[in-house]
């Protein structure tokens, strides 16, 4: 029996193994979150609630069918923070750390798993990268929790309560988990610009991409004035920053005469910036999202669909996919066959992957929304918003999550899971491995457009 199980595991592809590990993580999360000690007395808790919360926390989405503050005890909050940590940093990153502590050698198979889990394209330096990522994320969360916890002493009566809220907020923001224990997201801090600024920084650190953090760290400690940033870091940083800025301007323009009417300029500035940053995958909000106009909600859907960067805590099609699509469109419109940026020519295989990811994501969002329009009674925009939030593992909601039917919740859970592991991993999971063609047929042109 044991031998057969071992052969079955060996027969699985890296993508299938990663999916299996995340499934096991969800199972463990369900068990831990269902422990009586994890709940407050009298809390209403069902299996579907446990499963949904487990998938949401492992995928670091933040959509929830229960009120976190009213449902979970202090022990439950610690368990939730642990699951967010596990899902945010990545199973293989933490697995690498455990293997190294146990003195085990990281072999070729383990390196392949790490590559799939973190969307990396090469073996070289992968283990060292994971060690640096874990070190950086834990330090960011620690200092974020320390700063917020100390600051929260002005809000809460005891050190325990202040630092509990501070460290949970830091972990939730850095992992882009979207969970909160205030019971009202970041709305209680809508006029506290310091808390908003620190939270935005933590969201960015988690969503911009682990390789970018490592390169920035190396740059800061480098003795060379001209540090050779990789093409990935250049494209990711510019795209990520542009989306945050463009998103803030768009939200401001659409809400200036609506939800933002009559507010001070600094309130409007932080409202626009925070909501735009949260759409990268943060999931926290300083305003009731349902108060926003339909045009703004649709705009936010597009931002959530793009999501965070590859090899980060977030989901969506990813910022580099969006950037490559725009670059391909720009060069095609100018009559250029090759796509060039920063004195480099992009590989046709990467351009094809970005197109495949985008098309598959559109089909997934369309299909999930279509199913929800059949099973649910909410408006099309509300359902589309929920699906985009799940796919981008964002966690923003118009307040309909708890009202979804069991079928609707299952659909959202599937979308959250795919959003976390990534479209490419999902395709490799259900399809075959990449193979090189041994022969080619004659090429023929097809009329397009």
UniProtKB/Swiss-Prot annotation:
PANTHER family: KTR SYSTEM POTASSIUM UPTAKE PROTEIN D, TRK SYSTEM POTASSIUM UPTAKE PROTEIN TRKG-RELATED. The chain crosses the membrane at residues 17-37, 46-66, 75-95, 133-153, 194-214, 235-255, 297-317, 355-375, 380-400, 411-431. It is a multi-pass membrane protein. Integral membrane subunit of the KtrCD potassium uptake transporter. The 2 major potassium transporter complexes KtrAB and KtrCD confer resistance to both suddenly imposed and prolonged osmotic stress. It is found in: Cell membrane. Belongs to the TrkH potassium transport family. Ktr (TC 2.A.38.4) subfamily. It comes from the Bacteria. GO terms for cellular component: plasma membrane. The gene is ktrD. Keywords: Cell membrane, Ion transport, Membrane, Potassium, Potassium transport, Transmembrane, Transmembrane helix, Transport. GO terms for molecular function: potassium ion transmembrane transporter activity. The keyword Cell membrane applies. One of its GO terms (biological process) is potassium ion transmembrane transport. Homodimer. Part of the KtrCD complex formed by an octameric catalytic ring of KtrC and a membrane associated dimer of KtrD forming a potassium channel. This is Ktr system potassium uptake protein D. Its main location: membrane. Disruption phenotype: Impaired potassium uptake. InterPro entries: Cat_transpt.
